[in-house]
Curated annotation (Swiss-Prot):
The keyword Membrane does not apply. Residues 92-111 are annotated as: Disordered. It comes from the Bacteria. Residues 70-104 form a coiled coil. Pole-localizer protein involved in the regulation of several cellular processes. Signal peptide: none annotated. Belongs to the pole-localizer TmaR family. It is found in: Cytoplasm. The lineage of its organism: Bacteria, Pseudomonadati, Pseudomonadota, Gammaproteobacteria, Pasteurellales. InterPro entries: DUF496. This is Pole-localizer protein TmaR.
Length: 111
């Protein structure tokens, strides 16, 4: 009986750990969504800025700098999207483990 209670308590601790980890990953995903949105706005800003700059006003180096900045922002957006996919995969795995915990706990309580 003591072993069953100890295992049940350990299962509960595992479940709480998984629940907290899932919430942490959810917060990270939301943070990455904000970063994606911010960097997409920066890309749009640089596109608009590039439309207003003409060769008579500035040097060609300015265009090269803007192009580099745009590429950097686009790369950041891609990196955040990849990270979000990884976080979503981890959250899905955690949800599956939590569901397995629930089913095993209900089976144990029925016995």
């Amino acid at each position: 009986m003591a072993d069953v209670k100890k295992q049940s308590f350990q299962d509960m601790l595992d479940y709480v750990h998984l629940y907290r980890l899932k919430n942490k990953l959810h917060r990270e995903t939301a943070d990455n969504d904000r970063k994606i949105r911010d960097n997409q706005k920066r890309v749009l800003l640089l596109d608009n800025l590039n439309q207003y700059i003409n060769d008579s006003m500035t040097v060609e180096d300015i265009r090269a700098i803007i192009a580099n900045m745009r590429d950097d922002y686009e790369n950041r957006v891609d990196d955040y999207m990849i990270r979000n996919a990884e976080l979503s995969k981890q959250r899905r795995e955690i949800r599956q483990k939590m569901a397995a915990h629930k089913t095993s706990a209900s089976e144990k309580s029925e016995k």
